[in-house]
Amino acid sequence: MDNLKKQVGIKAAEFVKSGMVVGLGTGSTAAYFVEELGRRIAEEQLEITGVTTSNVTSSQARALGIPLASIDEVDYVDLTVDGADEIDSSLNGIKGGGAALLMEKIVATYSKDYIWIVDESKLSENLGSFKIPVEVIPYGSQQVFKKFEAAGYAPTWRLNEENERLITDMHHFIIDLHISQIKEPEKLAEELDLMGGVVEHGLFNNMVKKVIVAGNEGVRIINK
């Protein structure tokens, strides 16, 4: 599995050219993309500026010598590459398994181009196999949780290693929703967008036009 993730990370790095502002995703697959950019900077004199989507990715990028800037310090992001937890046949996706969904969506929204890199196990006809993370402010979060319960979304709190509520890089909580067969992700996203206390959710609808997939038969590209 790690080899598949590495293959798509290296392939995605081929789309990066000198002079670009590049959004650096978060997660085990995106880490291989960041690693390959670090290699190209060291060995090929690639010149880029990175915009990161989490504290974890910031630490990795600095260790690799990748120059960084905040999303507020650049005019735009040329290309963002990130992983995804599940992708449906229309290239809608669920992200946020690494609890970085808010920063990931902000960077993706202000990117000219956006690519997901995954292994083929992340592809499905309809979303629903993976939990949907919802980032909420602490104040009133119990009320939000109860509303999700009443809606039948089987919510659970995202916990840390100490079995306490996980606190995101932006100092929020995460409630994971367990909904099977999401046939109308746009409708669900609109519902979540309008809910008081919800900061962001892990439904990334109509945001990518290119997905790089690694499988047993090699790497392929799905274009929308």
Curated annotation (Swiss-Prot):
It holds the Pfam family Rib_5-P_isom_A. It comes from the Bacteria. Transmembrane segments: none annotated. The active site is at 104 (proton acceptor). One of its GO terms (biological process) is pentose-phosphate shunt, non-oxidative branch. The keyword Isomerase applies. Pathway: Carbohydrate degradation; pentose phosphate pathway; D-ribose 5-phosphate from D-ribulose 5-phosphate (non-oxidative stage): step 1/1. GO terms for molecular function: ribose-5-phosphate isomerase activity. It catalyses: aldehydo-D-ribose 5-phosphate = D-ribulose 5-phosphate. Its EC number is 5.3.1.6. Keywords: Isomerase. Substrate binds at residues 26-29, 82-85, 95-98, 122. Catalyzes the reversible conversion of ribose-5-phosphate to ribulose 5-phosphate. PANTHER family: RIBOSE-5-PHOSPHATE ISOMERASE 3, CHLOROPLASTIC-RELATED. Homodimer. Belongs to the ribose 5-phosphate isomerase family. This is Ribose-5-phosphate isomerase A. The gene is rpiA.
